[in-house]
Amino acid sequence: MPFTLGQRWISDTESELGLGTVVALDARMVTLLFPAIGENRLYSRNDSPITRVMFNPGDTITSHEGWQLHVDKVNEENGLLSYTGTRLDTQEANVTLREVLLDSKLVFSKPQDRLFAGQIDRMDRFALRYRARKFQSEQYRMPWSGLRGQRTSLIPHQLHIAHDVGRRHAPRVLLADEVGLGKTIEAGMILHQQLLSGAAERVLIVVPETLQHQWLVEMLRRFNLRFSLFDDERYAEAQHDAYNPFETEQLVICSLDFVRRSKQRLEHLCDAEWDLMVVDEAHHLVWSEEAPSREYQAIEQLAERVPGILLLTATPEQLGMESHFARLRLLDPNRFHDFEQFVEEQQNYRPVADAVALLLAGNKLSDSELNTLGDLIGEQDIEPLLQAANSDREDAQAARQELISMLMDRHGTSRVLFRNTRNGVKGFPKRELHTIRLPLPTQYQTAIKVSGIMGARKTAEERARDMLYPEQIYQEFEGDTGTWWNFDPRVEWLMGYLTSHRSQKVLVICAKAATALQLEQVLREREGIRAAVFHEGMSIIERDRAAAWFAEEDTGAQVLLCSEIGSEGRNFQFASNLVMFDLPFNPDLLEQRIGRLDRIGQAHDIQIHVPYLEKTAQSVLVRWYHEGLDAFEHTCPTGRTVYDSVHDELINYLAAPESIDGFDDLIKSCRQQHDALKAQLEQGRDRLLEIHSNGGEKAQALAESIEEQDDDTSLIAFSMNLFDIVGINQDDRGENLIVLTPSDHMLVPDFPGLPEDGCTITFERDVALSREDAQFITWEHPLIRNGLDLILSGDTGSSTISLLKNKALPVGTLLLELIYVVEAQAPKQLQLNRFLPATPVRMLLDKNGNNLAAQVEFESFNRQLSAVNRHTGSKLVNAVQQDVHAILQQGEAQIAKAAQGLIDAARNEADEKLTAELSRLEALKAVNPNIRDDELAAIESNRQQVMDALAQAGWRLDALRLIVVTHQ
């Protein structure tokens, strides 16, 4: 095409330069000025990587003054174009805009504009864009969206609770599972779902001070949620950045003590507009009607302002009725306002529980039992169901399940309280105790005597704590020259045990970090035993590396030496041998130690080894834990209660372990108290609530569906394709591990979620569970979600040209592959993606407007095509521009009809589901006061907004590919 001064051109290779203007010409060269950046570029007149910018009728263009023109007509005179049409800001008709006056910052965003402007993408990017659209749309439609991305085992009861609660509007619930059943994971799964769907954006987690780091690590490692820890120092720093320091972060963890200590801080927290608050160890919030504690009042203030609340607490039976009521009162003070009334109500639910027990037993029901069931579900005609349930027909079991479901909906606290017990959940291992009695070395005997004389003024509790760790007493006297490990028989025993069990992984826990470090040195130097260390002085990354080394099967560490605090929140269930080098001071810590291995999903019975020194506090405590509480071989929900009741007596025995007269009687009375409490707890179990919390067959089916999704290889293929195109290096390390590192030629300089020094990833859930240094890649992982956003939010792959070598078709035959997107714009919290995610509609049109997409599948067709370089592609486009316009018009006529069909289907689905949920809850509210008015109002409002948003849904062209047939 001949050049003329004033013409507008665009660079094929540097589209960010904007529109260029021809400002100089000679026989061989042309100079373009790019006003957007104020630079000139010199190009050859022949075969340069630049494309003439020509708009068409129907386009909207912008002048250099900023006003826009809808083009009706294009005129060419002396090689220069002028556009005539309607000015959009004044609606003035027949306005003419010369091309030299076009806005130089013009960006071509529509796929067809990019194609005509010569901005042609690589073919593989077009394919990636379509796959990204397709996969993203499919994932949003999955019923378990938000439940697959966490690094956890697929445990049915956890998935059931998260699925139920995570989909509610501003859920306010109490999670009261027994220890080891994963309350933290349930809370994390609910958070993950709510954040992913947009139902929540700001989250506050309030925990005891000792658990802050555990939660921080757990949220990051398991759910890829980056929380910020607020303490005094961080709070003071943030005050420089904002009036309310808590508004500087979306996801915050802080301690209960931090919340309680300052009135101003509590006010700032209350004003920070959180969507969801999690309170861990909520049973420590002390309440009575006359005198609620300051901690309780602080959380109560927050609970009045925060819409969604998750309280994590011990089981109701452990707490006692009044304490349990206090937790429920935080969730819904209008519903739970009178303790006496609450007690009476709970007693009234006994017939409901008895009725469920009858149905579960499967025996024939008597007339009186049938009448009881009829009375309990009185507002509905259930006669046919009762008859079916009491018959020998095939549908008898289904009828019983339906009746149980109806009873549970009507049960007092089943919507606000979830509680699972080990008895009701399968999959726990046995625990076997091996005690190893060892002689007390003379060096320790001497140190203990001297310590007794010098520490005469110490309290009994201080002496008891000292006596538990004789190596510390010895070291204090000997200083740096003390080498307790040379004579301590526990060290000899440990070395012997490890060398005779070299093929087994062993977790060793001791109270102090110094002990763990000294043991590592001894094991390494004396026996060459590979030992990793894990303590509170290490950073999270260092702990991850130690845990990963321990997890490696062949070349990894045989033993992991943990301090008490350092092991909080970490689970090592791939190991089943636990050595307690010393014993913790209270039963809760003992259970926490065993809980590192005793998790649901543990494949082997747990072997607990306790080497202890005779005539020391250790020998007293090992007997009290085992004989008095049965705390080694079974979980001990009574431990804290019994410990508190005999605290002073027990401390005296620990402080003076050589005087144990009467200790047998103490053990006997503790065991009696333990057995009585345990029987009481068992009797108080609410089996109806357990059935509801457990989820039954539905929960099992949910776990199986997600497991099936885990086995789908399409994610791996898509991810590798994405990483290739983005420019991320991939190094296969074997064992289903891949190392990703940034390259020098990335699509963007910093890929969100990819650290500068790279990261290790795996697509296997089992590998991710044993290798905490490896990120678990699912469709919900930030790397994939950020990758999808990167591709789909920009114009990557939105216009391309390919050649189709096919001798059955005439040379020069044109096909246009169009990817339309049908979507609705609405706030994220409406969760429109449940009904109408951005849905791609593919068309493959020939010159006559025939759509061949149904006959020609995308992937197989894509493999038959070959790429065209950008310069040749621009020439091809210019040659067939009018034909492409004609095909596009035919595509628009066809997509309008197809889009309306999708929109109507989405509206019908939304109306059906949301109306059914609202009707169900309104009907139940008549018999179950735990259904909140604000929840019903929110569902009604949400339904109306969803229907309105779907009515406004539309379509747009997202990508196109021009295909030209060749025989070469």
From Swiss-Prot:
InterPro entries: Helicase_ATP-bd, Helicase_C-like, Helicase_RapA, P-loop_NTPase, RapA_C, SNF2-like_sf, SNF2/RAD54-like_C, SNF2_N. Residues 164-334 form the Helicase ATP-binding domain. Its EC number is 3.6.4.-. It comes from the Bacteria. It is an enzyme of class 3 (hydrolase). It holds the Pfam family Tudor_RapA. One of its GO terms (biological process) is regulation of DNA-templated transcription. Keywords: Activator, ATP-binding, DNA-binding, Helicase, Hydrolase, Nucleotide-binding, Transcription, Transcription regulation. Residues 490-644 form the Helicase C-terminal domain. ATP binds at D177, E178, V179, G180, L181, G182, K183, T184. A motif (DEAH box) lies at residues 280-283. GO terms for molecular function: ATP binding; DNA binding; helicase activity; hydrolase activity, acting on acid anhydrides. Belongs to the SNF2/RAD54 helicase family. RapA subfamily. Transcription regulator that activates transcription by stimulating RNA polymerase (RNAP) recycling in case of stress conditions such as supercoiled DNA or high salt concentrations. Probably acts by releasing the RNAP, when it is trapped or immobilized on tightly supercoiled DNA. Does not activate transcription on linear DNA. Probably not involved in DNA repair. Interacts with the RNAP. Has a higher affinity for the core RNAP than for the holoenzyme. Its ATPase activity is stimulated by binding to RNAP. This is RNA polymerase-associated protein RapA.
